[in-house]
Amino acid sequence: NMITGAAQMXGAILVAYDSIXAA
């Protein structure tokens, strides 16, 4: 998704946020 795409650009915090959102 958009969050994952941003995370790939170096957003470690967004990775955690995306994981929480998915949970």
From Swiss-Prot:
Entry annotated with the keyword Magnesium: no
Cystine crosslinks: none
Coiled coil: none
Domain of life: Bacteria
Family that this chain belongs to: Belongs to the GTP-binding elongation factor family. EF-Tu/EF-1A subfamily.
Described function: This protein promotes the GTP-dependent binding of aminoacyl-tRNA to the A-site of ribosomes during protein biosynthesis.
Quaternary structure (record): Monomer.
Protein name: Elongation factor Tu
Lineage, opening ranks: Bacteria, Pseudomonadati, Pseudomonadota, Betaproteobacteria, Burkholderiales
